[in-house]
Structures are given as C-alpha cells and as structure tokens.
Regions:
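Short amphipathic alpha-helical segments
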Residues: 33, 113-116, 198
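RNase H-like DDE catalytic core and adjacent DNA/metal-binding regions
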Residues: 1-101, 108-110, 123-137, 142, ...
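Residues that form or flank phosphate/diphosphate-binding pockets in enzymes
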Residues: 116, 144-147, 170
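Short beta->alpha junction loops
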Residues: 108-115, 165
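Short small-residue beta-strand/loop micro-motif enriched in glycine and branched aliphatics
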Residues: 102-107, 161-163
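Domain-scale segment recognizer with a strong primary affinity
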Residues: 4-12, 27, 35-38, 51, ...
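A short, polar/charged loop-to-alpha-helix boundary motif
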Residues: 114-124
Length: 257
C-alpha cells in the first residue's frame, strides 16, 4: 500500500519524476493514488515552496520541422556573493535548447562575455555532429551580439538572429525556469548553496522526463526514429494555431480612412 513516505521518497529521488509536478507522480504511481499524492505534496515543504501558478497565455508557436533547425540560447545569472563563494567562482549558466527535440545543454561559466559564449556554442556544434545547426536565436545581450560569436556562426554557416518581442527566446527562457527550479529544490533539500554540484543530476532528470509539448522525453526525441512522430505532433499544434488566428478585418481594395 502506498504511503506519504513513498511519495516523498519518489519526489526526492533522481528519476524523471523527481522534483516534478503532481502529474508526473500520478503518472508514476497511477491515477488510483491521486488523492494520496495530493495530500503528500500538500505537506511537502519543498513542493509547496516552489509550486507556481501560471495564468494560461496563448502565443503563436515556433514553426520547426527537424532537429537542430533552431537552437535558442541564453545565460542564467547566479552572480550573487552568497552563491559565488560556494561555487568555485562560477557565476553563470550558459543554456541552450533545440526547439524541435527539446534537448538542452548547460555549461557553468565564470565570465559573462563574448569569448565564453563562443566557446559554449562551439561545444554545442561539436556535440550535435553529424546534425547541422541551421539557425541560432538569442536575445540582444552583448554576449551574443559580438564579433567572436557572429564570426563563428558565420564560419559554420549558421543563421543568427535576435528575439525582438517581449517573449524573447521563449523556449530557452522556459527551460531556464525549469533548470533553475530543479537546482534550487535540490539545494534546498540538501541545505547547501553549491548549485554546481547538482547540474548533472538536474539535467539527467530533465532529459529523461516526458516533456509536455512533445509527449516524450528529450532523449527519446533525439532518436531519428521518433522525428516523424514529432513532426506529426507539431503539425497538430500548427493547425490549431492557424485556426486561432484572427481573420483580418479588411480585404484588399477596401476603402479605409
């Protein structure tokens, strides 16, 4: 018989459902245990402390059809004296994500500049081989809008462009929230300020966890055998998005003021 202790042990393990949502634990234990899981999580200090309510908001999707068609990148700032002193001088996390497969990369860095960004991008290009990155998107931060990065991407024949709307690079921004929440939960559970020790287990959880958008884990999505299934999932999203678009109020040749 399932107990609250079993639920908490599963929540704190390093499996795909660890430090996750209520739904991930229900999927793990079964719908019959939903009530007990809800009660256990309601008494779980880490879960309740970091639980977020998000008001649904509709955005037009990114139109992608293959792996490495679009990579989004960003930098997470951990430049807080209380944290820097405990993390060997590391102040930032360089993050990047494949918008199609949701596969992600994170690299701890000490300096927030053009050279470190170029080095991180080069690692992603190398690890992606033989897949060819086609497009690279980021915000207009100085660490991306600089000579080293621009020249490197040009040399690799990768199209670079910047996010100009208030959404910024929305997919990597959402990934940033996911990885930060995992790191802070693990730090809180272990009562430590060394986030650098939890990068590997946090990424293991993320890469093995079923992603809500693609209905599979990023590791499963990386397999070429699943790319056609991914395309079908995205095409359903695109069809719904097109139906939601407002029809124009005017037609060609209409007289307007």
């Amino acid at each position: 018989m399932l107990t609250k202790e079993d639920v908490n042990n599963a929540y704190y393990s390093e499996d795909s459902h660890s430090f996750g949502s209520k739904q991930s634990l229900i999927k793990h234990f079964g719908k019959a245990e939903k009530q007990l899981i809800e009660k256990a999580l309601a008494d779980n200090d880490i879960y309740t402390r970091y639980h977020l309510y998000r008001k649904p908001k509709y955005y037009s999707p990114y139109y992608v059809y293959r792996a490495r068609q679009l990579i989004q990148a960003d930098v997470i700032n951990f430049d807080n004296k209380d944290l820097v002193d405990f993390n060997d001088g590391y102040k930032y996390l360089f993050t990047a994500i494949d918008v199609f497969t949701k596969y992600a990369w994170v690299f701890p860095i000490k300096k927030h500049n053009c050279k470190t960004s170029q080095q991180c991008i080069a690692r992603i290009v190398q690890e992606s081989n033989p897949l060819k990155i086609e497009n690279f998107q980021s915000d207009r931060g100085s660490e991306f809008k600089c000579r080293d990065v621009i020249n490197y991407l040009s040399k690799e024949n990768i199209n670079q462009y910047y996010a100009l709307s208030d959404r910024k690079a929305a997919v990597v921004e959402r990934f940033n929230l996911t990885i930060q929440m995992l790191l802070y939960k693990m730090m809180d559970k272990s009562m430590t300020r060394r986030w650098i020790d939890f990068i590997e287990p946090a990424m293991k959880i993320y890469l093995h966890r079923t992603h809500r958008t693609i209905k599979m884990s990023p590791l499963e999505a990386e397999s070429s055998h699943n790319h056609q299934t991914l395309r079908e999932i995205f095409m359903q999203k695109y069809t719904k998005a097109n139906l939601r678009k407002k029809k124009p109020k005017f037609k060609v040749s209409d007289t307007v003021r």
